[in-house]
């Protein structure tokens, strides 16, 4: 995190003050390689999820169904590495996730180390796709590719959790980023197939699809087109998006030999409680006050109610963001990031690596300086709040307040003297 701040001060600050074409991009690329390289030799950091991935793949390999059975039904070396919390839970991930796991475990047998190495390679491939796509998206939208790469890819949350933690977000976000880039180049079929493939990895990828529909509308019915043409293009684009994404998922489901059981598990688990999720944060604030008047009140009961309310708010928020971000391609990319933010704020469970879907896009759509600063602060705060063993400090108020102060001073130092209008809105 400290190195990221220093890179912001020495490379990004001068570029924001006096923009040069492609200025600072090569420096950030070299720094990114230097930061990622040591992590390629490291074991899982900040999470043990990769062992669950291996376990789920071994279950499919051995004839079990991870959508209806927990890991405990298939004892072996992988199970010993799975957290106790997840040994009796089903998986919410899609058929591509299980297919990859089956292929990996079929290749390595029950060798845990070899399996982890292969997942490290897969996470690196996803990360490379992100690092390749994001500057190109920024360039296409007239934003600064160096700023986009520093803010969205080199930040500590992305590197720690996608490379260090080896989360399947790496492949999912890599596919979505590549799909959005394809859409900006009017390769809409490729874009939808890429997003559909990402959905087969993790369902949240589908959030990007409605914004690709706006891009299709702008291309096939540009400004000045008749209302009837716009309506026809909109309807046909929507139908094409739904059909192609379903086709991609169906093909992967069929080829992998898995099932559609993930649709019933897509809401995920509710065991994780941390204030990154809005319903949990609201419960943490409300519960002490409720206890004053209702000493027997249950934290979990209040949380369950707020999670239900938050789900309704999420649906309303997603529709609102989609509708408001319809003007042009820049709006569509900005809306994709905003929609992911809405989803994760109101989701029942939010973990730090979920923010990869948001952070990666934040520098691509010519964000105003205040938004760059805010994103920098959030990335710093989240990046240092989770330790290498996966525990967090979000209920340590001295830590929280201290890190907010540190993040604020870091932001002032990084962006000292940068004019507000230098990064156009």
Segments from the language model and where they lie:
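Start-transfer (signal-anchor) and selected internal transmembrane alpha helices
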Residues: 1-38, 328, 333-334, 414-425
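Transmembrane-helix motifs of polytopic, lipid-linked glycan transferases
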Residues: 2-12, 117-141, 173-174, 316-322
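Intramembrane catalytic core of multi-pass membrane enzymes that act on lipidic substrates
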Residues: 21-124
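Specific aromatic-rich, kink-prone transmembrane helix
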Residues: 129-133, 172-187, 340
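Perimembrane helix-loop-helix junctions
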Residues: 208-246
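Aromatic-enriched
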Residues: 366-425
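Transmembrane-helix signature of polytopic, membrane-embedded enzymes
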Residues: 22-30, 134-155, 330
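Aromatic/glycine/proline-enriched transmembrane-helix motif characteristic
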Residues: 140, 268-346, 417, 421-425
């Amino acid at each position: 995190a400290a190195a990221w701040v220093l890179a912001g001060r020495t490379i990004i600050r001068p570029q924001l003050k006096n923009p040069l074409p492609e200025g600072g991009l090569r420096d950030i690329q070299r720094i990114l390689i230097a930061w990622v390289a040591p992590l390629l030799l490291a074991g899982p950091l900040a999470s043990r999820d990769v062992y669950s991935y291996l376990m789920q793949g071994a279950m499919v390999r051995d004839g079990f169904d991870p959508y209806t059975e927990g890991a405990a039904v298939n004892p072996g070396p992988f199970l010993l590495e799975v957290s106790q919390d997840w040994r009796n839970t089903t998986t919410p991930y899609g058929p591509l996730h299980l297919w990859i796991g089956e292929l990996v475990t079929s290749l390595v047998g029950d060798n845990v180390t070899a399996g982890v190495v292969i997942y490290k390679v897969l996470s690196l491939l996803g990360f490379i796709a992100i690092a390749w796509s994001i500057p190109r998206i920024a360039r296409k939208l007239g934003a600064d590719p160096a700023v986009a790469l520093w803010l969205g890819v080199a930040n500590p949350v992305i590197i720690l959790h996608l490379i260090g933690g080896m989360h399947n977000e790496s492949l999912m976000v890599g596919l979505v980023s590549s799909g959005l880039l394809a859409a900006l180049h009017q390769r809409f079929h490729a874009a939808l197939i890429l997003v559909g493939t990402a959905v087969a990895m993790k369902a949240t990828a589908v959030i990007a699809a409605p914004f690709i529909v706006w891009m299709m509308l702008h291309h096939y019915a540009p400004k000045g087109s008749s209302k009837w043409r716009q309506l026809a293009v909109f309807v046909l684009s929507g139908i094409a998006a739904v059909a192609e994404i379903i086709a991609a998922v169906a093909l992967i489901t069929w080829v992998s030999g898995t099932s559609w059981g993930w649709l019933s598990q897509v809401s995920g688990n509710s065991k994780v409680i941390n204030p990154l999720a809005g319903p949990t944060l609201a419960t943490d604030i409300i519960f002490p006050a409720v206890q004053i008047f209702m000493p027997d009140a249950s934290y979990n009961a209040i949380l369950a109610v707020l999670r239900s309310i938050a789900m309704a708010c999420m649906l309303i928020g997603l529709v609102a963001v989609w509708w408001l971000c319809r003007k042009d391609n820049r709006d569509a990319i900005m809306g994709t990031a905003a929609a992911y933010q809405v989803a994760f704020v109101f989701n029942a469970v939010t973990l730090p690596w979920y923010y990869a879907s948001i952070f990666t896009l934040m520098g691509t759509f010519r964000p105003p300086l205040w938004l760059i600063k805010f994103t920098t602060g959030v990335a710093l705060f989240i990046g240092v709040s989770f330790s290498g063993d996966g525990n967090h400090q979000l209920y340590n108020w001295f830590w929280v307040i201290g890190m907010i102060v540190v993040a604020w001073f870091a932001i002032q130092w990084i962006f000292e003297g940068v004019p507000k209008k230098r990064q156009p809105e």
